[in-house]
């Protein structure tokens, strides 16, 4: 028998990487009541890549936008106080190493930081947060999951797994903990089959739900994030997906667990399975961050190191996504961006009158969009995320004259620009519908 030493070395290197990595627009609806013409206009704000301000409207519903072994501790950036500002009065963010990253406010959807966030990336195991969200939305935690032969055999010895066996039974909640904390790939497969009957049906559900959450360039082919050329997303899209997860209390309850979790013996094994969360910013871990509320790690050779993290301080909840990163650097980058975000931004609640004062007939009236209607527009009260030295008075709203309004079966769509201090902070897609359209919609308050 001949021993392939090169193959053995490659296997060891791959295993070390996996051990090392801990893993084997703003879009909100703005209701505007039209005094004449009995039309309702919906604005879905989609923040561009340089956007920082966000708006969260009370009494509204989101809809998809129409328009990814040796521990080395790095020194954090100095973010103990508010950082300097650029020539437009905008906070200057810390330098990071991750190739693609984004920092958003989980409540308003405001984009506080963006680095090539629309670049196509492989998400690796961060995919599992969407698998978890769909499971919570479609199952009870006490339902019994039976592992199929396909699910049990879907992993190799070097993949993250918990050794589940064909025919083994666990509760949905136990499988969720195994997937989100330990990153067990066969458990993601089993949940997909339990929810939808097959992996292919589940991935269709994943792609549809991702769009509903605001993803623009995402396509998933599996429930775990194992590499596939057609399994991709962007940091921006993953932040939108993570926002849906962070706003689900049951998801946060499971994902924020920093103590050990044990799956007791089952019908196929007499041995209990005990494990901890692989996210190293949780309490008691190497990169402990006191405001960390969970998240998900990921790694494949093709994706590099990936990371989704939730954090909360005072009244602000932030989400950070780092893709195309290194083993330890993703945690350092995330911590520095969180510190910078908490130090430099604030949330303010405004009255409808405050926002309505931004509207002028010149900004909104355009015969190409509204035809014969003479509009009287009103906005609900809102929460905004802005740099600490800015106010709602710094925000301007204008109709984009370079965008030609489009029509789809009599429903017109136009575009607004939101700016502050000469920065384009957002874009709004205006949809105009008739009273019949309004009556048919169950999503409107």
What are the residue ranges of the model-derived segments?
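Domain-terminus/edge residues, biased toward the C-terminal soluble/receptor-binding domains
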Residues: 215-216, 229-232, 236-237, 242-445
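Active-site-adjacent loops and short helices of periplasmic peptidoglycan-processing enzymes
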Residues: 53-236, 240-249
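Membrane-proximal envelope biogenesis segments
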Residues: 46, 58-83, 89, 106, ...
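Gram-positive cell-envelope targeting signals
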Residues: 1-62, 445
């Amino acid at each position: 028998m001949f021993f392939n030493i090169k193959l053995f070395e490659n296997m060891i290197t791959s295993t070390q990487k996996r051990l090392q990595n801990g893993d084997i627009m703003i879009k909100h609806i703005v209701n505007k009541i039209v005094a004449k013409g009995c039309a309702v206009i919906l604005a879905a704000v989609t923040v561009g890549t340089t956007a920082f301000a966000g708006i969260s409207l009370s009494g509204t519903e989101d809809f998809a936008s129409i328009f990814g072994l040796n521990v080395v501790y790095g020194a954090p950036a100095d973010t103990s106080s508010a950082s300097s500002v650029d020539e437009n009065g905008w906070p200057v963010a810390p330098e990071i190493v991750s190739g693609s990253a984004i920092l958003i406010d989980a409540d308003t959807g405001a984009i506080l930081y963006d680095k090539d966030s629309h670049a196509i990336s492989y998400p690796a195991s961060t995919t599992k947060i969407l698998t978890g969200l769909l499971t919570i939305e479609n199952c009870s935690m006490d339902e019994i999951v039976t592992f199929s032969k396909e699910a049990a055999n879907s992993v190799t010895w070097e993949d993250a797994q918990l050794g589940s066996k064909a025919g083994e039974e666990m509760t949905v909640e136990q499988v969720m903990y195994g997937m989100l904390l330990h990153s067990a790939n066969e458990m993601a497969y089993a949940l997909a089959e339990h929810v939808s009957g097959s992996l292919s049906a589940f991935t269709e559900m994943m792609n549809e739900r991702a769009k509903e959450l605001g993803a623009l360039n995402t396509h998933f082919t599996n429930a775990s994030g194992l590499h596939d050329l057609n399994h991709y997303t962007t940091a921006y899209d993953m932040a939108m997906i993570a926002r849906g997860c962070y706003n689900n209390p049951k998801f946060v309850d499971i994902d924020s667990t920093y103590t050990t979790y044990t799956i007791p013996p089952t019908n196929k094994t007499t041995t209990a399975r005990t494990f901890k969360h692989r996210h190293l910013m949780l309490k008691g871990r190497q990169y402990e961050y006191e405001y960390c509320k969970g998240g998900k790690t990921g790694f494949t050779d093709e994706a590099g190191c990936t990371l989704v993290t939730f954090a909360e301080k005072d009244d602000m909840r932030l989400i950070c996504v780092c893709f195309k990163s290194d083993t330890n650097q993703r945690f350092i980058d995330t911590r520095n961006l969180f510190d910078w975000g908490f130090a430099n931004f604030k949330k303010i609640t405004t009255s409808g009158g405050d926002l309505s004062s931004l509207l002028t007939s010149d900004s909104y009236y355009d015969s190409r969009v509204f035809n014969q209607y003479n509009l009287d527009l009103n906005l609900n009260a809102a929460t905004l995320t802005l740099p600490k030295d800015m106010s709602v008075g710094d925000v301007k709203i204008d109709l984009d004259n370079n965008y030609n309004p489009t029509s789809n079966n009599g429903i017109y769509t136009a575009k607004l620009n939101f700016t502050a201090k000469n920065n384009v902070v957002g874009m709004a897609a205006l949809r105009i519908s008739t009273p019949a359209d309004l009556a048919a919609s169950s999503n409107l308050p």
